[in-house]
Amino acid sequence: MSPVNESLIDFPCDFPIKVMGKSHPDFQTTIVEVIRQFDGGFDAERVEVRPSSGGNYTGLTVTVRALNREHLDDIYRALTGHPMVKVVL
């Protein structure tokens, strides 16, 4: 039997995170600033941006360098706690 805390993810790794929020001119820049608090080498040029069909929401895919489970959890907490963010996957 495998240990309960064993992760299915091998760290460190590049981990894609999808972030969705209301469309706003500063949404992408703000999310990049949040990510850079945890990944100083994050390349903002690699952010994938997808507006919703109605243009009311924006979806971003950001690929972060996750060092361990706690690091990844901290990134998720910072994103989900941000007022501009509606959903993080």
UniProtKB/Swiss-Prot annotation:
Gene3D superfamilies xref list: 3.30.70.260
InterPro entries: UPF0250_YbeD-like, YbeD-like_sf
Disulphide bonds in the chain: none
Domain of life the protein comes from: Bacteria
Record-stated family: Belongs to the UPF0250 family.
NCBIfam families reported for this sequence: PRK02047.1
PANTHER family referenced in this protein's UniProt entry, alphabetically: UPF0250 PROTEIN YBED
Name of the molecule in the record: UPF0250 protein Bphy_0213
Species whose genome carries this gene: Paraburkholderia phymatum (strain DSM 17167 / CIP 108236 / LMG 21445 / STM815) (Burkholderia phymatum)
